[in-house]
Amino acid sequence: MKPVILATASALLLAACQTNSYDSLAYGPTLTPVGQGLEAGRMPVPQPFQQAKERTFRSAYNLNSQSMYRALRAAAVGDVIRITIDIDDKAQLDNNTNRSRKSASDVGFASALNLSGFQSGSTSGSASGNLGLTGDTSTDGKGKIDRSEKLRLSLAAVVTEVMPNGNLVINGSQEILVNYEVRVLTLGGIVNPLDVTSNNTVAYDKVAEARISYAGRGRLNDVQQPAWGQRLFDAVNPM
């Protein structure tokens, strides 16, 4: 009976260690459904109902289309805007901390004691002592950061909300599957319509509350990540 219980417990433990589903292990990662990136991260402001404009009789111009006198810039919910990402950052930090502290204390005392009643007559005695305390603490710390980041991409995002002051809330995502590895690029933020160029493009550094994510998922990413048991052990290990 004990071998059966041991085998069952081992099987359950191995099943718990599995972080991916069978489909993911057999066929690799899958792409998210189209349109999932259009979901805004917060509740949008209700948009007023717009009555569709009717076409003028025997007119070659459709009033429902884009205006011939207006720049083709994103301005309404559902419009597409192009975001250019050109990051070339470099940071170097070098910190050094050294702290030392010493303390010493010396206390002496002397006292005369008179004892009587134990024997005939009286006896006298004396006591003396010396108490010394010393302490020494020191701290030495050093830290250095040297990092460089380069990222040059472009992404088409969709306007998911028009704020009361006219700013545009955008959200976009892009996924590419190559050799069972998915490259995922997501971007979200708030754009001022005045920063949109005539070709309907805005730079990433003009996007307020920008959230840019460039990551991946798949078999290669799973191998690079430590197992969840190791991460749990590192979280509770005090040493």
Curated annotation (Swiss-Prot):
Span list, region Disordered: 120-145
Entry keyword annotation includes Transmembrane: no
Q: Where is the lipid attached (S-diacylglycerol cysteine)?
A: C17
- Listed InterPro entries: Flag_Lring (IPR000527)
Q: What is its main location?
A: membrane
Q: Which UniProt keywords apply?
A: Bacterial flagellum, Cell outer membrane, Lipoprotein, Membrane, Palmitate, Signal
Signal peptide location: 1-16
Quaternary structure and partners: The basal body constitutes a major portion of the flagellar organelle and consists of four rings (L,P,S, and M) mounted on a central rod.
This chain belongs to the protein called Flagellar L-ring protein
> Per the UniProt entry, what species is this protein from, by scientific name?
Azorhizobium caulinodans (strain ATCC 43989 / DSM 5975 / JCM 20966 / LMG 6465 / NBRC 14845 / NCIMB 13405 / ORS 571)
Q: Tell me the gene name.
A: flgH
